[in-house]
Structures are given as structure tokens and as C-alpha cells.
């Protein structure tokens, strides 16, 4: 239409109005470029009688470029160039740009979390002052929120173009003539093309095209396209789930081969058999990339003089057209060229329209980070003494470049930490607490695939090893759990310690907190309780094993000593047997030696070549369910300052093979009783009883003295003596008196109850009052769950008689009247 009007009126066909400016441009010539998913740019040359136009009069001003045929371009002046000045006028060139072009002047490093691509784009647009009427999302798909979207050293324009290209969303520009602003439509399907754009296809005749709007001079390019796109990715969150997808979009293009894309960023494989796979799945990205390949399989170029042609339209050339134009042409790039003295030239690029696939912007690669970025681990509580982890052991961090005011503990996504060793609930993980400096690395440089590479010390968190202790290797936790290894020659040591109870294992050259020597060898200590437990057996030895050479369980020295003493004990046993003394149970000791000590079978064996001592500030107790054996190749000495007691449930034997058996009391009496049997004294030689005072013999029934065939019997008030030889009595005087007798001294022999019965379970109760004192003479009745009963009264110590049972059973006790009722 502009060309048609120019034939008659000779007036200016192009106008440039700059808002809020005194500059009145007269358009000389122009060149414009508009494309899908790109900001438009119009370079306009103009003349003005005003010389030296101040830049502030033009730059960052809204402006409108109008054609008399009806096309209006609203934008922002972003560039002004002075070309020349004559006597009458000055010659300038300015650039009229899309408002989106202004996003190219803001470069950011930013992190967006848990937002979808459209949400992030909208946030960026609104940050630059664009409102709801300035843009519109016409999307057929629902886009899921991403865990993270990173903007890295990109302008805001580069950033939104990149993330939109990743998901195949394109955008086109429309002009709002009412508000005189450019607006933007974001779309993801063919449904949002502009249809019903028709122009006749007419090749120009000669140098004149008749000024009628048309298209002409079609050119086409056809290329072989990839036949199949296959994708694969790895998602550590579902490590065992296959992440493969293969897609081939039906088309008329000639295709061959396969494009395999590994590490395409997606979380789920998706259904690659579906024509509409789940958004942002592996199948979605495979289809998207194949659509891009098909976009390049056929290209169309046309010339036109129609000013209203714009990217995003589906142009339907009318008339006798080639096959490539029959379904229409999706306009992807339109350039305009015109001047004050020449007609409008429009150059159109596009691709054949098809319902099988849509225009997709070329994929813009993500920026890559092939190093690390500084960050700090972050907890929800400042200075948290414990690591802030999720159920997978991942961390939150705050990147040093992040300027957002996000809530503590939510500044970045959950991150895995690289470790020197990992496996199924096994590995090496030393948790990092709030404020620890870490280096964030990126898998294959992908800015949206971060992980913690390692931790570092800094000025606020100094290294625990430095020039002052450079010979040490230290692992220390915040609670001062510590593994320290000293490599200083001649002072090597290892310390494993925890603050709880000051529990430590120290080996080698032992030092104190100041590094001063306090011992050598090995030390295991704690302020709390200690346990050494070995289920198969424990060998504790002071036998030397130089330079750690030899078997760990080398017990030859200890076993030889035990075997030698057992042989000596066997000889003593034989002598005791010949002397009719009580035999020692040597067989059980030999059995233990063979079955327990030699194989170290569930026993504890102590060995020391030069001596062993056990000491206690209070009590020292040795107990055994069966036997206690003490053997010595020399002497056994037992000394006590109080009482010494030897109690035997059955027999007690003392046998001295070659020396004397001596029993002496320095102050108290010596008392020997056979409470329920005989008492025998025998000597192969002379038997002597002597006293510095009196000797009394008392027998309740009789006393009989026998010697050399003669006897003396005292019985039932009679004195009887007899001999087979001479009876000699040598006395100075003999006195006779009346009958008399001396009573036999009464000796009380207590009844000793059984305390232990082999093969029986036993229990004994003590009855105490509220003050804790024993209660004597209290009737009691005890019943077991297997029917056995026991009754009696408590003694002076409040004790009931010990009860025995062959089976373990629950006991019930009644006291006092309740007990008497059951008697």
C-alpha cells in the first residue's frame, strides 16, 4: 500500500515520532529485522535541522515508526549515531528496539528455586517493569517447577531466551497501537500462530511490480534430517530407574541416522510412545530436539512488498504455487528495507507449515562452570552446632554470589557432597556444620547440576594443621572427637579420643596437652565405665614380640608355663593319693588347658614373663561357676590384716608333701571341730600335746586312752584301767574322799544348712521394716508357680531359709497373718 500511495501524492510515507522529545525527525531510509524469539531492531536514518542533538533527548525514549500503509512499530530508542551535518540539516541514525532489548543491559548471577520456566520468565519481565498487559503466555502444556534454574553471567535477555529455548517456547511481538507499546506472546504450539494471512503469488514483470501487495521469487532448501533422537540421563534420586527415551516425529522430510543425547537434563524418562509425552521428561526433550532437526529440513525464502508481514504468521500464497507453499509458510524472520525515495522491500524467511510439529527456537547452550564456586553450608539456625541434613544426607548452602535475601537454610537446593568412599549405607561422611566454606562443582560444567566437591578452611575457620604442628595428621569433629597421628620421627603416636568421659586410646609416644612426654607404649583410659569384650577369647600378654613380628595369638610361652605347672600338680596329686589326702581336681585343669586355653576358646588368658599383680583399693573378688585353680612353681603366700576364711561346701584338704603343716594362733584360740563326724589326729612319730597352762579332755560318753597294750577308760561315772603287765603307781600321798563328778562342758554345734546344691536354682529373702532394719520371728509362706511351698519364721537377721528348686519359677511371698492363714 505504501508503494501504491507513493505513485500519486509524492508525500513522505514514513514517520518517526519520539515521545517526550523536541526532536522532529524526517525519515530518510530504514532497515528493520523481526524474528521469532528475538527482539526486533529497526535502524532508521533521518535528517533534522537540529544539529548536535543531545543524546538524552533521544535515548531511552519511547518512539513509534509509522508507515502510511498502516504498519506501526512501537519501541525504545537504544542508539543514536551522528553521521554528518550540512548547512541546512544534520544526518543521524538511531536504533528503535524492542523493550525486551533493554533486558540485555542487565547481567546477573542469580538462582531461582522451585519455579517453572514460565514463572521465572514472568518474574524477570516484571522486574523490568513489564506488566500483565505487556505479555501473555498462551501455553498448551503445563510446565513443572524445577528444583533449580541458574542464571550465570548472562544478561536477562540471554537468560530468558535460553530457558525458553530449553523447553521449546517461542515468542512473537505484537503492536498495541492504543498504548503505543510493543507486547509479547509466548506460545508452545502451532495453535498460536497467526492464520488467515493471504497474498497473491505474482512474479514481477520487468522493473515494476504494479505496487500491489504480493509475494514472489520463492526459493526453497531441503536437507536430510536426523531420523531419530535418543536421550539418556542419570538421576541419583532414582538411581536404579532406566532413563532412556527414543522419539521419531513423523514428517515428510528425508531422514536417516540417530542423534544420541546423553545427560539431557530431565528427572523422568517419560513415555516415548506418546505423541504428547510428559512435559520436561526425557521423551519430551527427545521430541523437542527432533522437531528442531525437522525445522531445519526445509527452508523457504520469499520477497514481498507487504508491510504487514511479521514473524509468527502463517502466510498462504495464492495462485499457482509450488508444493512447498501449498500448506502455507510459517514466517520466522522478516526484514524490511525502504527509503524516502524508494519502495518498501520485504524479505521473508520461513518453513513449511505442518500440524505434526511446531517451530522451536534454536537451543541455546547453558553457560558452563568448569571449576568451583565458593559457598557456605547453611542451617535454619545460625551457628547451629549440628549439620543441617535431609533424609538423603544432603546439605543446604548459600553461594557467595547469591544476593537474594532468602530465608536461612533455603538459599539453594539440597546438595550431595562428594566423598572419598560411598556405598549402600556405608561410606565416609564427616558432617559439615553451619558456616563451613565449601567448593561447589558442577557435573560436566552444567550450572543446574551442582554438588559439594570439598570443604575448605578460611580466615574465620583456620586449619587445624599448620606450620606449628606440620608433622601431625588430624581428624577432629566439632565436639572434639579426635583422631591424631604424629609423624615426627622418634615421637610417633596415635591418639583416638572423645570428650565424653575423656575416653582415649593412646599409642606410641604419649604426650600431654602441651606436647610434653608423659609416657610411651599404649594407654586405654576413661573417666566412665570400661569394657573389653571378645566373644571367642581374649589374650592379654606382657611377653615381648619384637617389632610386631610373629602371630598375634602366639601363646606358646604362656601355655608352656601352664603345662609345666600342671605336670607338677599331677605329681603332688599322686603323693596326696598315696597319703590318703584329699586329691586336687587336676583333671578339670588339664581339660580346661586342652579344650579352652590352647585354642583360646571363650576364655581370658593373662601372661607375664616376670610377674603379675592385682590390687584393689577396697575389694578383690575371684569367682567361678565350677573350679578355681591356683598353681605355683614356688610359694603361695596369702597375708591379711583382718580375718581369713576358707569355706568349703563339701571337703577341705591340706597336704604338705615334704615339709611341715603348721597352724598357729598368735593371740586367739585354735579351735578344730568335726560337727557331724569324727576328729582324727595321727602322727607317724611322736604326737605331743602341751600347754603352758591347763589341758582338759572331755567326752560326753567316755574317754579311752590306749598305749602299749594298757588302757584307761572313763565312762558312766566309772574309772577303769587295765594292763597285761605291771601297774606301778608312784605317789607321795593318796587321799580318799566322798563321791564327786565334774560336768562335761556344753559345746553348742550349730546346724549348717545347704547353701549351694548342684543343679538347683535357689533364692533367699530378707525382711526389713520401713527403717531398713531386719525383722525377726516373722512368719512367712513362699509358693512357687510350679506348686512347691516353703514356710517358717525369719531369724535374727530377718532372713528366710534359702529355698531350692530344680526349675526356674516365679515365687510369691506372704508375711505375718497372711502367711499363717496358708500354713
Please tell me what each predicted stretch does.
Residues 1-823:
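Amphipathic alpha-helical and helix-coil boundary elements used as assembly
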Amino acid at each position: 500500500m505504501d508503494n501504491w500511495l507513493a505513485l500519486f501524492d509524492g508525500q513522505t510515507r514514513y514517520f518517526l515520532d519520539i515521545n517526550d522529545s523536541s526532536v522532529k525527525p524526517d525519515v530518510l531510509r530504514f532497515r528493520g529485522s523481526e524474528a521469532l524469539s528475538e527482539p526486533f531492531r529497526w535502524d532508521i536514518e533521518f535528517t533534522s535541522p537540529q544539529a548536535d542533538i543531545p543524546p538524552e533527548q533521544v535515548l531511552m525514549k519511547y518512539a513509534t515508526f509509522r508507515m502510511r500503509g498502516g504498519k506501526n512499530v512501537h519501541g525504545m530508542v537504544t542508539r543514536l549515531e551522528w553521521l554528518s551535518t550540512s548547512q541546512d540539516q544534520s544526518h543521524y541514525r538511531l536504533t528503535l528496539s524492542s523493550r525486551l532489548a533493554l533486558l540485555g543491559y542487565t547481567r546477573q548471577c542469580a538462582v531461582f528455586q522451585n519455579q517453572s520456566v514460565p514463572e521465572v520468565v514472568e518474574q524477570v519481565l516484571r522486574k523490568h517493569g513489564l506488566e500483565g498487559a505487556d505479555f501473555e503466555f498462551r501455553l498448551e502444556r503445563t510446565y513443572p517447577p524445577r528444583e533449580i534454574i541458574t542464571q550465570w553471567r548472562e544478561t536477562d535477555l540471554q537468560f530468558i531466551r535460553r530457558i525458553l529455548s530449553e523447553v521449546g517456547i517461542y515468542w512473537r511481538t505484537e503492536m498495541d497501537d492504543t498504548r503505543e507499546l510493543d507486547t509479547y506472546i509466548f506460545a508452545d504450539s502451532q495453535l498460536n500462530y497467526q492464520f488467515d494471512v493471504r497474498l497473491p503469488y505474482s512474479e514481477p514483470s520487468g522493473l515494476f511490480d504494479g505496487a500491489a501487495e504480493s509475494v514472489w521469487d520463492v526459493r526453497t532448501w531441503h536437507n536430510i534430517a536426523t531420523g531419530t533422537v535418543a536421550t539418556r540421563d542419570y538421576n541419583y534420586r532414582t538411581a536404579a530407574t532406566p532413563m532412556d527415551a527414543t522419539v521419531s516425529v513423523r514428517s515428510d522430510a528425508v531422514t536417516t541416522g540417530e542423534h544420541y543425547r546423553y545427560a539431557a537434563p530431565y528427572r523422568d524418562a517419560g513415555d516415548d510412545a506418546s505423541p504428547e509425552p510428559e512435559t520436561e521428561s526425557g521423551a519430551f526433550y527427545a521430541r523437542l530436539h527432533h522437531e528442531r532437526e525437522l525445522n531445519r529440513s526445509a527452508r523457504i525464502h520469499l520477497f514481498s512488498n507487504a508491510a504487514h508481514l511479521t514473524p509468527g504468521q502463517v502466510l498462504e500464497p495464492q495462485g499457482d504455487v509450488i508444493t512447498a507453499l501449498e500448506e502455507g509458510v510459517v514466517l520466522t524472520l522478516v526484514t524490511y528495507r525502504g527509503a524516502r525515495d524508494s519502495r518498501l522491500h520485504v524479505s521473508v524467511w520461513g518453513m513449511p507449515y505442518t500440524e505434526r510439529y511446531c517451530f522451536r527456537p534454536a537451543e541455546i547452550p547453558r553457560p558452563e562452570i568448569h571449576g568451583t564456586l565458593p559457598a557456605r553450608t547453611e542451617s535454619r539456625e545460625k551457628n547451629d552446632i549440628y549439620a543441617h541434613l535431609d533424609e538423603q544426607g544432603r546439605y543446604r548452602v548459600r553461594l557467595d554470589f547469591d544476593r537474594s535475601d532468602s530465608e536461612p537454610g533455603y538459599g539453594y537446593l539440597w546438595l550431595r557432597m562428594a566423598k572419598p568412599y560411598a556405598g549402600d549405607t556405608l561410606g565416609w561422611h564427616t558432617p559439615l556444620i553451619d558456616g563451613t566454606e565449601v567448593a561447589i562443582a558442577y557435573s560436566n560444567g552444567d550450572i543446574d547440576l551442582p554438588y559439594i566437591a570439598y570443604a575448605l578452611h578460611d580466615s574465620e575457620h583456620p586449619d587445624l594443621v599448620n606450620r606449628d604442628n606440620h608433622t601431625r595428621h588430624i581428624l577432629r569433629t566439632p565436639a572434639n572427637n579426635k583422631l591424631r597421628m604424629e609423624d615426627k620421627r622418634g615421637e610417633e603416636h596415635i591418639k583416638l579420643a572423645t570428650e565424653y568421659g575423656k575416653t582415649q586410646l593412646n599409642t606410641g609416644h604419649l604426650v600431654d596437652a602441651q606436647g610434653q612426654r608423659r609416657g610411651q607404649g599404649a594407654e586405654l583410659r576413661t573417666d566412665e565405665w570400661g569394657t573389653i569384650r571378645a566373644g571367642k577369647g581374649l589374650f592379654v600378654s606382657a611377653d615381648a614380640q619384637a617389632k610386631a613380628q610373629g602371630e598375634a595369638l602366639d601363646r606358646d610361652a604362656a601355655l608352656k608355663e601352664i603345662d609345666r605347672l600342671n605336670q607338677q600338680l599331677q605329681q603332688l596329686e599322686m603323693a596326696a593319693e598315696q597319703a590318703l589326702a584329699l586329691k586336687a581336681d587336676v583333671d578339670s585343669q588339664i581339660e580346661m588347658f586342652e579344650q579352652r586355653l590352647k585354642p583360646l576358646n571363650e576364655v581370658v588368658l593373662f601372661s607375664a614373663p616376670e610377674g603379675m599383680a592385682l590390687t584393689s583399693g577396697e575389694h578383690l573378688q575371684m569367682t567361678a561357676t565350677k573350679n578355681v585353680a591356683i598353681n605355683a612353681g614356688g610359694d603361695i603366700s596369702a597375708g591379711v590384716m583382718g580375718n581369713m576364711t576358707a569355706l568349703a561346701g563339701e571337703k577341705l584338704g591340706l597336704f604338705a608333701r615334704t615339709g611341715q603343716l603348721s597352724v598357729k594362733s598368735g593371740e586367739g584360740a585354735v579351735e578344730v571341730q568335726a560337727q557331724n563326724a569324727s576328729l582324727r589326729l595321727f602322727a607317724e612319730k611322736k604326737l605331743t600335746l602341751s600347754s603352758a597352762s591347763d589341758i582338759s579332755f572331755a567326752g560326753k560318753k567316755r574317754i579311752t586312752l590306749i598305749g602299749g597294750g594298757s588302757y584307761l577308760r572313763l565312762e558312766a561315772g566309772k574309772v577303769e584301767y587295765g594292763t597285761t603287765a605291771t601297774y606301778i603307781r608312784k605317789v607321795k600321798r593318796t587321799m580318799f574322799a566322798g563321791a564327786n563328778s565334774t560336768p562335761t562342758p556344753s559345746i553348742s554345734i550349730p546346724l549348717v544348712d545347704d547353701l549351694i546344691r548342684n543343679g538347683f536354682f535357689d533364692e533367699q529373702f530378707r525382711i526389713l521394716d520401713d527403717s531398713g532394719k531386719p525383722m525377726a520371728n516373722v512368719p512367712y509362706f513362699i509358693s512357687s508357680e510350679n506348686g512347691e511351698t516353703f514356710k517358717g519364721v525369719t531369724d535374727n537377721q530377718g532372713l528366710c531359709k534359702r529355698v531350692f528348686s530344680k526349675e526356674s519359677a516365679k515365687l510369691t511371698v506372704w508375711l505375718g497373718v497372711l502367711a499363717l492363714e496358708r500354713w
